[in-house]
């Protein structure tokens, strides 16, 4: 939430002029009149807290800074000049006179009237010489009386001494020593420049000071005569053209330079340096004066600084001790020497008696006269521009004559316009009078027309009423005759209507009896047609019902097979866990046997046993490895069997889904044939539309019946084929088991050869698998055991069952029943065992 409320547009010009109660204006030089005028137009801003209280000054100040509203001199509209037309000239003059320094800025905005008032309100400072006061007998009394009044002077002297230390003065001023009373006298003399009167005490007449003052006054008057000040405020910005006319002034420095034969640029540089030092000294004097004026409003009896009072007391005691005649003589000698130096340096006394000075003055006067003749009989337009009266008249004529011509043209146009306006007004008045007369005639004619039309309407009304009455009577008589005729006609039509109703009732009875007889005959005929159509429908739908029953029976068998496969899968998983446990046991035995072999090797080295005992131990190791390979082979066969059973379960599920869809399709076909049969019977047709049946089913009813008969035969032959395939599989399984038992016995056949045969049989099975189009193992790896023959034989069963299913399912391609699955990768345990056996043989 904002600290201040929104400012209205009418209050924007008042913001920044004044703050809350007791605030001062931004400018010191604004007068009382402008302040009064500004205070009337000011309006207090609406700034409140959420509780309704006014904001503090700090909050107002921060809010103004935040929103860009700041009390600055640029926003104080009461400051300025009284005449708005002279504002630009005033601003230009101030900008030309003002020096771009901080002190000049302060100096420009300090009202001299304020300093005068402050100096008048302060205590009068009495000028007193330290030497004369020391010699006088009443000096101590005057000092004791002046102690209470010296505190403002002491502060001023301190400020003056501080400024004197920082500024660079000439060697003459640096060699002098000032006392406190002399500093106060200097301040009093400076304050006299601001029209502050000094009233010294009566004392002995000092003619030297009077003569010095007269000489200075004479010098100033001569300077004013030689270099008169020319004011140039009439045409805008003040320029320095009049000051450049007399570049050589007969001052002390100029005369010294002429006598010393110094070049003009160097003399100008020296003059500038001295001018800068004089300005600095004047600034220090003004600063001291400002400090003195600043302390005048304080109590004169109170000491501002005790150290200053202590220094003044010490100096008084020191000066009281210097009352000897020697000091006075030295002081007088110094004063005389200084006066002699001043008289010698004053070259103006020799001004009119020195021929060189006169020659230089004549040369300067001639040069100035030549410069002035350039601007003779010319008017200064300001900014260094001088024009002759002829040029001014020419410029004025060039600027004013077009304006006068334009004025005359506009006056002529205005006169023509006035004449045209007068003519138009006269014509308008004439037309207005004519229109008014016409309106009056129209009104009178309208009144006459109204009366005549009213009379005519009355007469026409009477005649029309009489005509209407006569016509109405004739119409009534004519309508009465017509009504009598219509009544007679109505009686005749009523009698005819009664006779017609009787005739129609008799005809309706006869027609109803005939229709009842026809309906009975048609019902009997329809019943016969329905019985015949039902017989035909049963004959047509019999193969569909048979197919539906066969499909449901096959679905039940497939569900039973799936349950058997799931049971076999669980049994195989248990067997796989058992085999894995045995393999881990054999692995532990192998580790123990390895440790035992290591120990036996050590013992052989130590005891030197025979080769037979070593071979017997190695044969034990080989037997254990063979048992492990056997268990791993059984594990791989069980895993292959498990994968194959999973594949069988997936195929059975797919076939069950397919049978379900076929059952639904056959049901829909039966419903379709029944509906078509009903439609044909309703139409009275003996047969179904074979073309429509062919479009919907894809074949005619006769073809469909023949195809269903062949399917029934195939379904009847399927169980016998499956039994034969199962018997062949059992025989092959027994042969494989017998071979495994022979290989496991180890009599006359080493284990390594058995493992090699197993790998060969597994590779042979892999070559047969692509022929059967069922990918069971990983094609890239030839690391399968010998018992994969079982999976190959089982794949034959699957292919046979697939063929049987394809023969049963009509309208479905055999490729749609193929179920692709990712083959499982068996571990390379057999080859690892062979590698281990070969390593043992090498050892």
Curated annotation (Swiss-Prot):
Cellular component annotations (GO), alphabetically ordered: plasma membrane
Subcellular location(s) of the protein: Cytoplasmic granule; Cell membrane
Modification N-acetylserine occurs at: 2
Composition skew (Basic and acidic residues), residue ranges: 781-797
Name of the coding gene: EIS1
Species per Swiss-Prot/TrEMBL record: Saccharomyces cerevisiae (strain RM11-1a) (Baker's yeast)
Biological-process GO terms, alphabetical: eisosome assembly
Membrane topology listed for this record: Peripheral membrane protein
Keywords in alphabetical order: Acetylation, Cell membrane, Membrane, Phosphoprotein
Name of the protein this chain belongs to: Eisosome protein 1
Residue numbers bearing the Phosphoserine modification: 2, 88, 130, 182, 401, 584, 710, 763, 775, 816, 828-829, 838
Disordered as annotated region, ranges: 13-44, 120-174, 717-843
């Amino acid at each position: 939430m904002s600290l201040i409320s929104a400012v209205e547009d009418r209050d924007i010009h008042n913001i920044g002029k004044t703050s809350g109660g007791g605030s001062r204006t931004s400018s010191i030089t604004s007068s009382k009149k402008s302040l009064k005028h500004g205070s009337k137009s000011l309006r207090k801003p609406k700034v409140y807290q959420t509780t309704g209280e006014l904001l503090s000054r700090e909050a107002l100040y921060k809010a103004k800074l935040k929103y860009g509203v700041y009390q600055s001199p640029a926003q104080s509209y009461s400051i300025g000049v009284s005449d708005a037309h002279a504002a630009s000239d005033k601003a230009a003059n101030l900008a030309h006179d003002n020096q771009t320094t901080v002190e000049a800025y302060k100096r420009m905005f300090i009202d001299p009237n304020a300093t005068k008032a402050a100096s008048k309100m302060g205590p009068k400072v009495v000028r007193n010489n330290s030497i004369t006061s020391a010699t006088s007998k009443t000096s101590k009394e005057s000092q004791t009386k002046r102690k209470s009044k010296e505190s403002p002077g002491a502060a001023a002297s301190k400020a003056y001494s501080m400024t004197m230390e920082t500024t660079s003065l000439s060697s003459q001023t640096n060699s002098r020593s000032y006392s406190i009373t002399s500093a106060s006298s200097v301040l009093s003399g400076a304050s006299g420049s601001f029209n502050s009167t000094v009233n010294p005490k009566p004392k002995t007449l000092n003619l030297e000071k009077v003569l010095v003052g007269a000489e200075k006054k004479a010098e100033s008057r001569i300077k004013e005569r030689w270099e008169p000040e020319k004011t140039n405020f009439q045409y805008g910005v003040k320029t320095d053209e009049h000051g450049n006319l007399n570049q050589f002034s007969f001052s002390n420095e100029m005369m010294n330079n002429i006598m010393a034969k110094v070049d003009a640029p160097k003399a100008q540089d020296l003059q500038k340096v001295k001018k800068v030092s004089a300005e600095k000294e004047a600034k220090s004097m003004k600063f001291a004066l400002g400090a003195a004026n600043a302390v005048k409003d304080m109590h004169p009896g109170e000491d501002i600084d005790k150290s200053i009072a202590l220094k003044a007391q010490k100096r008084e005691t020191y000066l009281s001790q210097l009352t000897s005649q020697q000091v006075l003589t030295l002081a007088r000698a110094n004063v005389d020497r200084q006066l002699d130096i001043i008289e010698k340096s004053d070259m103006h006394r020799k001004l009119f008696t020195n021929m060189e000075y006169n020659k230089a003055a004549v040369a300067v006067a001639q040069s100035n006269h030549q410069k002035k003749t350039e601007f003779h009989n010319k008017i200064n337009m300001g900014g260094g521009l001088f024009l002759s009266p002829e040029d001014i008249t020419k410029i004025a004529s060039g600027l004013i004559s077009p304006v006068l011509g334009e004025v005359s043209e506009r006056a002529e146009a205005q006169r023509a316009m006035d004449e045209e306006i007068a003519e138009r007004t006269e014509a308008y008045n004439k037309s207005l009078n004519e229109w008014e007369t016409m309106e009056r005639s129209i009104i009178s004619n309208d009144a006459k027309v109204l009366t005549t039309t009213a009379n005519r309407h009355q007469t026409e009304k009477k005649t029309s009423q009489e005509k209407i009455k006569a016509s109405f009577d004739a119409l009534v008589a004519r309508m009465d005759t017509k009504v009598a005729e219509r009544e007679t006609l109505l009686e005749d039509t009523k009698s005819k209507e009664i006779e017609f109703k009787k005739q129609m009732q008799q005809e309706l009875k006869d027609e109803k009896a005939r229709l009842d007889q026809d309906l009975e005959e048609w019902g009997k005929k329809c019943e016969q047609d329905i019985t015949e159509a039902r017989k035909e429908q049963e004959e047509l739908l019999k193969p569909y019902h048979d197919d539906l029953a066969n499909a449901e029976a096959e679905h039940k068998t497939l569900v039973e097979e799936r349950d058997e496969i799931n049971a076999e899968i669980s049994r195989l998983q248990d067997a796989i866990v058992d085999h894995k446990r045995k393999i881990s046991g054999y692995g532990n035995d192998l580790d123990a046997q390895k440790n035992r072999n290591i120990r036996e090797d050590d013992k052989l080295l130590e005891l030197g046993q025979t080769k037979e005992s070593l071979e017997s131990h190695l044969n034990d190791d080989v037997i254990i490895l063979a048992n492990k390979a056997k268990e791993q082979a059984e594990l791989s066969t069980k895993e292959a069997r498990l994968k194959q059973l999973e594949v069988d379960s997936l195929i059975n599920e797919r076939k069950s889904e397919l049978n379900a869809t076929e059952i639904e399709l056959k049901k829909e076909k039966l419903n379709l044939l029944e509906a078509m049969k009903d439609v044909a019977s309703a139409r009275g047709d003996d047969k179904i539309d074979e073309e429509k049946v062919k479009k919907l089913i894809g074949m005619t009813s006769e073809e469909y019946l023949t195809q269903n008969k062949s399917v029934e035969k195939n379904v009847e032959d399927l169980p016998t084929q499956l039994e034969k395939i199962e018997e062949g599989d059992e025989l092959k399984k027994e042969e494989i088991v017998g071979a495994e038992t022979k290989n496991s016995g180890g009599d006359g056949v080493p284990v390594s050869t058995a493992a090699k045969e197993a790998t060969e049989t597994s590779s042979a099975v892999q070559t047969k698998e692509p022929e059967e189009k069922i990918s069971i193992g990983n094609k890239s790896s030839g690391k399968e055991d010998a018992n994969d023959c079982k999976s190959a034989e089982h794949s034959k069963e699957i292919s046979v069952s697939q063929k049987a299913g394809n023969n049963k399912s009509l309208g479905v391609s055999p490729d749609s029943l193929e179920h692709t699955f990712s083959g499982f990768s068996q571990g390379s345990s057999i080859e690892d065992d062979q590698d281990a056996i070969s390593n043992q043989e090498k050892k």
